[in-house]
Amino acid sequence: MDAKTLAYINLNAILGSIPRLCEMVPEAKKLIEGKDVSIGFDVKDGPAATLVFKDGKCSFVDGVDKCDVKLPFSSPEKFNGLIDGTTTPIPTKGFTKFGFLLKNFTKLTDLLTNYLQPEPAALKDPTFFETSTILMFHLIVEALAQIGNHDDIGKFSAGYITDGAVKVAIGGGPAAAIRAKDHVLTADHEDPGDDYTSCMEFQDIHVARDLFDGNINAVASIGQGKVRICGMISQVDNVNRILDRVALYLT
């Protein structure tokens, strides 16, 4: 597993899930009410992005030029330590906003962990199950793009993906797309509608969850009609090769 690739996943896919968490979970939304602060994560030889909290909403933007609180990391490994709890960052600016980082932001990340690594009992609640699965869906789509751009094996597979969009969807639920341009992948978290060259659709949210958790086999699910693929099959095939790498980074 490559530390730099993991850093891109941890920032763009894991922390990048916080805006959606704040949108979907009332408890998260309450934590950012009335807050006006932005937290920048600046990883040397790695990614840089800012979480912006304003007007009761959260957004994720590239770069750290306009952040209030800046958290620098000397290497991808140090940043990955933030996610696994082995690194305590020291901000280089924004000390007056540090209270939000220590209290509200920590509670947000704990809440996110509850949804991304849920207890089995929690998944028995239909609302929690749906929210958790949708968060996982978008996280996996983003992680797939990051692996295709940074992981050596992922880049090899991305090298065979022709320009276009692979729509990834859950029947009766969300849809997103992996867009390829000159073998660089971008995760588009909006429903592409009919703007795609190939498609992979999970039958329903329960099938998607079983696949995400590794409880059912993807190839067998295609044969059983639980996963539908169409369009340029070579695109889907190479995306699935990258998808196989996702579990390595998210475990």
Cite the ranges covered by each PLM segment:
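Feature captures hydrophobic
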Residues: 1-251
